[in-house]
């Protein structure tokens, strides 16, 4: 792999700017027959909580025009399984590891981050789209003061760089980015899914049991690119951009809008080779454009 693809994110060097979006790549094991995990900049795990979460009732997924809705409910086996099973597997394959963390309270997040402080993990991604059960169910990422507070709490105990995953379901995402930057975040990732709904007109009911779900896929990309651009012009910390990335051109849009790294999500479901193909495509682009480094295009659109 060309050294020209290397990027620095929050003080860490990644061989290329491509990772996986949490929840779309399992723990890496599920895709290992399609992708050499050490070829990716990093593997981002599915969200992990302090205890196993059962997830939402089924049906939990519905196809939509240009994407999909999901209401999995962050089902996961918990931090013990991640440490005992998933991390050793990723280490065997020389993958850089970003662990996505979820929780129902500030204490939940802190507990997981404290456990991970003892592990060989490269970076943490904190999912603040989770509902805060102690604040009436509002997501941590929907109020700036809550986002700043949770950022400060996890930064106090974290041993790895911390990036905060921002929800697009807010009035002004730049205010959320500024809040987590003030809380000490080392970076931000965006966007998480947009809230959507689909109705089954034949059954005259909701297409998914949870009624609403997170919308992802190509349909959200223009919103995601716009938000990445806005955040890049509002904060000084680096951005992991995501939302509808299917191919190299999509990834380039995010980089030019101001993202330092990109994450591929829904595309993994219909093309398990997507991440690997994008790495190859970026390498070809750098050579074709005669760039000395992929970083030359980051934020080039003003």
Regions found by a protein language model. Name each.
Residues 40-41, 46, 122, 186, ...:
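Short acidic/polar active-site loop segments enriched in Thr and Asp
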Residues 295-302:
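A short, charged, Gly/Pro-tolerant segment at domain boundaries
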Residues 49-54, 131-133, 195-198, 269-271:
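Short gly/pro/ser/thr-enriched loop/turn and capping motifs at secondary-structure boundaries
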Residues 55-65, 199-213, 255, 267-291:
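C-terminal helical cap(s) of enzyme catalytic domains, especially alpha/beta-barrels
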Residues 104-240, 246-257, 261-264:
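Alpha/beta enzyme core
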């Amino acid at each position: 792999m060309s050294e020209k693809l290397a990027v620095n994110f929050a003080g860490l060097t990644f061989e290329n700017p491509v990772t996986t979006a949490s929840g779309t790549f399992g723990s890496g094991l599920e895709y290992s027959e399609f992708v050499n995990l050490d070829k990716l900049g990093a593997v981002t795990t599915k969200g992990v909580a302090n205890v196993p979460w059962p997830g939402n009732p089924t049906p939990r997924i519905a196809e939509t025009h240009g994407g999909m809705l999901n209401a999995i409910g962050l089902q996961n086996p918990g931090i013990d399984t991640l440490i005992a099973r998933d991390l050793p597997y990723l280490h065997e394959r020389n993958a850089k590891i970003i662990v996505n963390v979820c929780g129902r309270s500030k204490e939940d997040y802190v507990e997981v981050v404290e456990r991970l402080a003892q592990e060989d993990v490269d970076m943490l991604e904190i999912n603040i789209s989770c509902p805060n059960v102690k604040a009436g169910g509002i997501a941590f990422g929907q109020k700036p003061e809550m986002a700043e507070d949770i950022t400060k709490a996890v930064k106090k105990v974290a041993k790895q760089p911390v990036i905060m995953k921002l929800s697009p379901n807010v009035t002004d995402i730049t205010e959320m980015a500024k809040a987590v930057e003030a809380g000490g975040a080392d970076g931000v990732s965006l966007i998480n899914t947009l809230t959507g709904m689909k109705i089954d007109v034949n059954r005259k009911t909701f297409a998914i049991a949870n009624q609403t779900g997170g919308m992802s896929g190509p349909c959200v990309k223009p919103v995601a690119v716009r938000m990445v651009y806005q955040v890049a012009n509002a904060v000084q910390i680096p951005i992991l951009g995501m939302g509808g990335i299917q191919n190299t051109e999509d990834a380039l849009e995010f980089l030019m809008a101001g993202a330092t790294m990109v994450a591929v999500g829904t595309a993994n479901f219909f093309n398990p080779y997507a991440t690997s193909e994008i790495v190859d495509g970026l390498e070809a682009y750098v050579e074709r454009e005669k760039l000395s480094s992929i970083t030359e295009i980051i934020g080039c659109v003003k």
